[in-house]
Structures are given as C-alpha cells and as structure tokens.
C-alpha cells in the first residue's frame, strides 16, 4: 500500500531535484543539518524512561533547540571509548542489509528503544544516511531543515518500504520544525503520501511544542479477513 503512494512523493518539489554532473563520490547524511534523534535513558521503571526523546543537539546555541545552527558535537555512544567515528563503528551491529540498504543498530543501554542508522545505496558512488529511532511498533524519522539532499526522494521511498516489510512497523512518524519556511509544502507532500498531522498530546510522540509531527499507519489485513 505504501508502494502505490510513493510516486506522489518522488515527484514532490519538497525534495531536491537531481542535478547533472553529480560529484563522483558522495555519502550524504540527510539529517546532518538537524542532528538527530537521540535516546535518553533515565532511571526508574516508568514508561517515561523508555519513551523516545527527540533532541536535535546536546548543546544548542541561540535559537530554537530543534534546529540550532550551533556546531554539534559528535554523538557519544554509551559504552564507547570516545566521540570518534571509530568508536561509532565499533559500537554498532549490522541489523539488515540488501542490495539497496545497509542498516546498523547502535548499542544502547535501553532494550526497548533501538537507534537504527539506515544507509541507502543510490549508486555505487552515492549513498544517503538516515538516523531513525524504533520504539515499540513505531519508527521515528526527522526531516532535516532546508532542501533535502539530491536523491533523498528515492532514499525515503526505500526507507518506508523497509519500515513496512522488514521492521513490520505499525506507524511511521516524521517530525520537523513548525517555523520552517517550507512547512506548508511538507504538510501537503506527506499528506498526499498518507501521513496525517499528529495532534499535541498524542501518547506516541514527545511533548515538543516547537515541532510538527505527522504519522503514517500501516493497514494490515487480519487473519480472519484473509480467511473470508
């Protein structure tokens, strides 16, 4: 059902158009300008301790926390030996791989919420990375500020298929800053795809008054319906 709707988003002007003469090699982080979904584990046994937390920078500068322009320190992986890329690689396990995707899982102390780094291979020389959080039956994806990287339209389509077919997710949530200039275009684009605006107070999203959330719910046939 997602595949039948993907063409609407593939041609959307919200995604950067492909340019001729692309650079021969590029690995693009789609969320690089708005880092990143983060997992904060707190003490106690309440449900709050395992809830996904969407904080885009550890030390925000002036301006909204959601998309601060201040430099962001590299993510420190719990249990790692520093903030280097080497530590990041050592603290991640291969989660899934095929001819289009390579997905690694960051090791965390929280066994209820998983951080997945999704790298889609558009060509041999061009790849796009998305950092997502899988919590329960929901996958959370942050839409970065500004024009998305070239090729992100195809990359996002593959990501949705992965969420449905491999993760068997019940919901996919996207989030972006409310005050961004292309907010109306994003709402229109993802509404065409089947996403719906999430009202404040929804139990599956964090309390972020500065952020807009949209949700896509996968419709699955029950075993009883299949027998009929």
From Swiss-Prot:
The keyword ATP-binding does not apply. Residues 36-55 have a biased composition (Low complexity). Keywords: Polyamine biosynthesis, Transport. InterPro entries: Acyl_CoA_acyltransferase, ODC_AZ, ODC_AZ_sf. GO terms for molecular function: ornithine decarboxylase inhibitor activity. GO terms for biological process: negative regulation of polyamine transmembrane transport; polyamine biosynthetic process; positive regulation of intracellular protein transport; positive regulation of protein catabolic process; viral translational frameshifting. Pfam families: ODC_AZ. Induction: Induced by a ribosomal frameshifting mechanism in response to increased levels of intracellular polyamines. One of its GO terms (cellular component) is cytosol. Interacts with ODC1 and thereby sterically blocks ODC homodimerization. Forms a ternary complex with PSMB4 and OAZ1 before PSMB4 is incorporated into the 20S proteasome. Interacts with AZIN2; this interaction disrupts the interaction between the antizyme and ODC1. Interacts with FAM171A1. Ornithine decarboxylase (ODC) antizyme protein that negatively regulates ODC activity and intracellular polyamine biosynthesis and uptake in response to increased intracellular polyamine levels. Binds to ODC monomers, inhibiting the assembly of the functional ODC homodimer, and targets the monomers for ubiquitin-independent proteolytic destruction by the 26S proteasome. Triggers ODC degradation by inducing the exposure of a cryptic proteasome-interacting surface of ODC. Stabilizes AZIN2 by interfering with its ubiquitination. PANTHER family: ORNITHINE DECARBOXYLASE ANTIZYME, ORNITHINE DECARBOXYLASE ANTIZYME 1. This is Ornithine decarboxylase antizyme 1.
């Amino acid at each position: 059902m997602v595949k039948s709707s993907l063409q609407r988003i593939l041609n959307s002007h919200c995604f950067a158009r492909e340019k001729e003469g692309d650079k021969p090699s590029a690995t693009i982080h789609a969320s690089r300008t708005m880092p990143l979904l983060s997992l904060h584990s707190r003490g106690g046994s309440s449900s709050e301790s395992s809830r996904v937390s969407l904080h885009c920078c550890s030390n925000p500068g002036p301006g909204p926390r959601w998309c601060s322009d201040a430099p962001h320190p590299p993510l420190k992986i719990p249990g790692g030996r520093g903030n280097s890329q080497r530590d990041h690689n050592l603290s991640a396990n291969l989660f899934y791989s095929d001819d289009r995707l390579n997905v690694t899982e960051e090791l965390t102390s929280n066994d209820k919420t998983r951080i997945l780094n999704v790298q889609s291979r558009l060509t041999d020389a061009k790849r796009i990375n998305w950092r997502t959080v899988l919590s329960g039956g929901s996958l959370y994806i942050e839409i970065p500020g500004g024009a998305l990287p070239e090729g992100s339209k195809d990359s996002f389509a593959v990501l949705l298929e992965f969420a449905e077919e491999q993760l068997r997710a019940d919901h996919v949530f996207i989030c972006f800053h409310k005050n961004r200039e292309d907010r109306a275009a994003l709402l229109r684009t993802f509404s065409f795809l089947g996403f719906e605006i999430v009202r404040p107070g929804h139990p599956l999203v964090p309390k972020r008054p500065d952020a807009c959330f949209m949700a896509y719910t996968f419709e699955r046939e029950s075993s009883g319906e299949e027998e009929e």
